[in-house]
């Protein structure tokens, strides 16, 4: 798990492409101080597993699904990327829950300055926008940001100078593609509210939920279920 607080930016040294996958090598510093094989590092918000490393670089495999769903396939030698190590159990929770599993990509449609802040407008698909709420959280290229506005097929975030200067946002321009990960809590809530998505029944069908009487109920979380359980 990550928190969306970028530790440093790294530089892509090379990307070796196969038929349907790739090996990404990134030059870095801070995220390598205690790295071990098999550790997770988020690269532009995508959780990757370290397969090789040295004092100043690491490599990770990028699978077909990841290349299709994220912007990593567009990286090239010299590209700058956001980096974050997986959160330690006793670490500071500075952002929000970020899994590193990208929901899709968006396109930067507008950038404007507002005093010392910079507003970024991101156009996204309906499958991503459905989970976005004003003042809620979203990860853009692995950066935990607060949604400032929703408008039609887009949403906007307001970025402070420190965040822009210490991430890849400062180099973004109109038309650029960014990785997007919705707040996972919203996705779980929607899943639990679906009929048949009860407490039991991991496959999502034939599921039942226990009522206050101890008897099983089908249909997931419903109004009658909430009333029966004191809500």
Model-derived features with residue positions:
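Conserved loop->alpha-helix
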Residues: 1-231
């Amino acid at each position: 798990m990550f928190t969306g607080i970028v530790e440093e930016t790294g530089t892509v040294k090379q990307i070796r492409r196969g038929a349907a996958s790739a090996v990404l090598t990134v030059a870095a510093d801070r995220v390598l101080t205690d790295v071990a094989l098999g550790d997770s590092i988020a690269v532009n918000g995508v959780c990757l597993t370290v397969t090789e490393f040295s004092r100043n670089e690491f490599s990770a495999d990028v699978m077909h699904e990841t290349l299709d769903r994220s912007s990593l396939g567009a990286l090239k030698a010299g590209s700058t990327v956001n980096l974050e190590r997986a959160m330690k159990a006793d670490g500071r929770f500075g952002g929000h829950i970020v899994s590193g599993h990208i929901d899709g990509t968006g396109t930067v449609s507008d950038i404007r300055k507002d005093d010392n802040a910079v507003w970024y407008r991101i156009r996204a698909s309906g499958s991503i926008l459905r989970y976005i709420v004003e003042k809620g959280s979203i990860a853009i290229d692995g950066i935990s940001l607060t949604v400032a506005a929703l408008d039609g097929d887009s949403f906007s975030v307001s970025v402070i100078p420190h965040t822009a200067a210490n991430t890849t946002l400062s180099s973004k321009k109109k038309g650029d593609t960014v990785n997007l990960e919705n707040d996972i809590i919203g996705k779980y809530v929607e899943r639990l509210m679906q009929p048949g998505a009860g407490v039991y029944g991991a496959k999502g069908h034939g599921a039942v939920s226990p009522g206050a009487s101890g008897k099983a109920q089908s249909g997931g979380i419903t109004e009658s279920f909430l009333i029966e359980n004191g809500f």
